[in-house]
Design a protein with these regions (language model features):
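Ligand-binding loop in jelly-roll beta-barrel domains
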Residues: 70, 81-106
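Conserved short histidine dyad/triad with adjacent acidic residue
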Residues: 19-21, 31-51, 70-73, 80-84
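Short, well-ordered beta-strand segments in beta-rich or mixed alpha/beta enzyme
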Residues: 36-40, 60-62, 97
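A generic beta-sheet turn/junction motif
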Residues: 28-30, 52, 91
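A short, N-terminal "cap"/entry segment at the start of jelly-roll beta-barrel domains
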Residues: 1-32
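Aromatic/pi-system hotspot detector in well-structured domains
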Residues: 60, 75-76
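Glycine- and acidic-residue-biased ligand/ion/polar-headgroup-sensing regions
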Residues: 52-64
């Protein structure tokens, strides 16, 4: 795949399961890592779940809550694969950079 470079301003914001997403580096059927910017509104309420891959969130704006703990801009959250977490909320809205490694069942 080589080198991929993208500017956030060149990527469309699309509606996704919970909020809106800018897919900076989309995964190819789970065979490659992915990076995205997620925009979550105050109505975001993602139930407890887990993934068969590691993931990280970096809070860019606003505030998000995971497992009842609030994280504000500048916070980096690492979640190991197969770790149940949630609910995930953004009571005042939030914008996060999300990285997920390549893994099964994405």
């Amino acid at each position: 795949m080589g080198v991929i470079a993208v500017n956030e301003n060149d990527v469309k914001l699309v509606k996704s399961g919970h909020g809106q997403t800018k897919w900076l580096v989309p995964s190819k059927n789970g065979a490659s890592p992915e990076m995205m910017i997620r925009h979550w509104g105050p109505d975001t309420n993602i139930p407890v779940h887990s993934h068969p891959y590691h993931e990280m969130f970096y809070v860019l704006e606003g505030e998000i809550e995971i497992n009842g703990v609030a994280y504000t801009a500048g916070a980096c959250i690492y979640i190991e694969k197969d770790t149940p977490y949630g609910p995930t909320r953004a009571p005042k809205g939030g914008k996060v950079l999300r990285y997920a490694e390549a893994g099964p069942s994405k």
